[in-house]
A protein has these predicted regions:
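Glycine-rich repeat segments that build the extracellular carbohydrate-interaction surface of secreted
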Residues: 82, 164-165
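A short acidic/basic microdomain associated with nuclease active sites
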Residues: 62
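Glycine-centered tight beta-turn/hairpin loop motif at sheet-sheet or coil-to-beta transitions
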Residues: 167-169
Length: 294
């Protein structure tokens, strides 16, 4: 008669193997507690790793997207939600989407390139070129972001004098433009601090956008639909983009807040590069009275 195959013994959890290796042999109850502890720790760790690639959580401190998203500087009443980082791997952002992206809030110099124009005019490490509150000025134009700074340099004709006034109020004459297309070409090196913003995507690369009489026009056609039923402000003298017909460069996006009168957005600082797109809000978790799919 064939002997029944013996059931293979279950291997103990790794944590039990470790403690036994060091001479501790816990009883049944403690062993079960240690096994469950290992399961929970591994599950939480894997979830954290997966979530870091799939989603991120965001709190909103301002009312720039009100009433779609509520903000509060104290964060006690501010909307808090999870952001889907996967969707835009399968489709491109499109006008009307609510988009989370990284935005420059401080551009600060590192030591300039040795022998460069930046070193010769005395630019030193640690100076704020621009912040989200105070722009730099290039060719008389207020610029808040790396994109806007380099766009301005690239747009100037050869022979143009390059004068930089930083957020700290210092003015530097970097000479005349020859073949330079970025401020870094003059020997300025910087580090950029970014934070997450949430706005509504209005126009994509290749489209022309204009705000007129409270409405938005894309390639001459007025945007219609519930997502665009807001009164868009265009009368502030500080606005530089979208007031006249403005072409959005390929690979960039033009973003506005739904609460146009209280939004620091693309009208001030221009365009968001594709590399700075984070994802789409999908689940509001705070406050509990507004919990749900966005």
């Amino acid at each position: 008669m064939r002997r029944k195959r013996e059931k293979k013994a279950k291997k103990p959890a790794y944590i039990l193997r470790i403690v036994r290796h060091y001479g501790w042999h816990p009883g049944r109850i403690v062993s079960e507690i240690l096994e469950w502890t290992e399961v929970i720790v591994v599950a939480v760790g894997l979830a954290a790793i997966i979530m870091s690639f799939v989603t991120v959580r965001m709190h909103v401190p301002t009312d720039s997207m009100y009433p779609t998203i509520n903000g509060d500087y104290s964060l006690l009443k501010a909307d808090s939600f999870f952001v889907d980082r996967i969707t835009y791997y399968f489709r491109d952002p499109k006008p009307g989407d609510i988009v989370v992206f990284r935005h420059d809030v401080a551009i600060r110099t590192k030591s300039p390139v040795e022998g460069s124009a930046a070193e010769q005019v005395g630019i030193r490490e640690g100076e704020y070129i621009a912040t989200d509150q105070v722009p730099a000025y290039l060719a008389g134009r207020a610029v808040f972001t790396e994109t806007a700074i380099n766009e301005t340099i690239a747009s100037l004709p050869a022979g143009s004098p390059i004068t930089l006034r930083t957020a700290q109020g210092n003015t530097y004459s970097l000479g005349q433009k020859t073949s330079e297309t970025t401020l870094q070409d003059f020997g300025i090196r910087w580090k950029i601090k970014k934070i997450m913003y949430v706005k509504r995507l209005i126009a994509v690369g290749g489209q022309t956008v204009q705000i007129r009489n409270g409405n938005i026009y894309i390639d001459g056609e007025m945007l219609e639909g519930e997502r665009f039923q807001h009164n868009y402000i265009s009368s502030d003298m500080r606005f530089q983009y979208g007031i006249e017909p403005t072409l959005v460069p390929e690979g960039y996006y033009f973003m506005l807040g739904d609460n146009s009168g209280d939004s620091f957005d693309g009208r001030f600082w221009g365009f968001v590069p594709d590399k700075d797109i984070v994802g789409v809000p999908y689940l509001r978790v705070w406050p509990v009275t507004r919990f749900g799919i966005m």
